[in-house]
Amino acid sequence: MDTVALGASGPASTRLSLQLGDAQSGLRAVTESSGSAVVVHVGGDIDASNETVWQRLVTRSAAIAIAPGPFVIDVRDLEFMGSCAYAVLAQESVRCRRRGVNLRLVSNQPIVARTIAACGLRRLLPMYTSVENALAPPA
């Protein structure tokens, strides 16, 4: 996979070591692309203080994905994911589907699954336990 650092300068890394936008944002991300697929690995926190940075990251990364995709967002290294993060993902999922790309979320945290279910977002934000599973073609 080619590694692309969005919103940060300097060399890209496969580790979650890049700060996006404001160094105080608390959000780290690395975006990788391979063929039509794009994977974003995120860590840190997503809340109202960095919602704009999160929105920009998701939108720019999704734009790289080409149908049939998928566009995978790995949130396993997030320490906090506020409601604004789910709203951004749901909106981007709708935009991706219009382009023939499926947004897939990777998480092993029960709270993420419960939040998605409680908000009625299961169809828009299908969850996978690993990036490998999320990248696999549908059975």
Model-derived features: where do they sit?
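Acidic/histidine-enriched, glycine/proline-rich intrinsically disordered or flexible terminal extensions
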Residues: 135-139
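Short acidic-hydrophobic, aromatic-tinged amphipathic segments that line or gate anion-handling sites
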Residues: 125-130, 134
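Amphipathic alpha-helical interaction surfaces in cytosolic regulatory modules
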Residues: 45-125
